[in-house]
């Protein structure tokens, strides 16, 4: 596993520690972001850093496949690199529509992918309309929902305290 992006930022909880705690083997890590700036300019510089660093790492690792999940710039970079290096690219959650820049990144990633795991039939049909071969598209559901389903119940009092919630007031959960 290569760790980068927001996993290495303090403002997002330096979640590389969670990855380590969960027992995943980390081959290497690198910082994509050149500043704490969330501007479009910083996003493009970060993407450039991902291309440069991941191409070096993937060349050295020589993986059998490149897994490019979701709609994140680093995953788009890995899909571009994998395709250029003739390594099969697997993309998760292609064909989704959000109406944001993420949608464009997701669709572009899908075009570099060879195998697609979609969350639903509509997303699969969208990929087929984009020219992807239906025999390489598999509807597998949403792994995030599976993860939520398998979460152990947390006492309400703990949730209220940890996240500073008041369940006497209306609460909306967005996933």
Regions found by a protein language model. Give the residues of each.
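Short hydrophobic segments within beta-strands
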Residues: 2-4, 92, 175
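Short, electropositive, low-hydrophobicity segments enriched in small/polar residues
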Residues: 17, 99, 145
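A nucleotide-sugar donor-handling region in carbohydrate enzymes
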Residues: 7-13, 113-175
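Active-site and donor-binding regions of nucleotide-sugar-utilizing enzymes
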Residues: 32-133
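Short, well-ordered coil/turn elements that cap or connect secondary structure elements
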Residues: 21-25, 84, 132-134, 167
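Conserved nucleotide-sugar phosphate-binding/catalytic loop shared by glycosyltransferases and other
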Residues: 2-46, 53
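Solvent-exposed, flexible loop/coil residues
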Residues: 23, 28, 34, 76, ...
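Conserved beta-strand scaffold positions in the cores of enzyme catalytic domains, especially
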Residues: 26-29, 89, 136-139
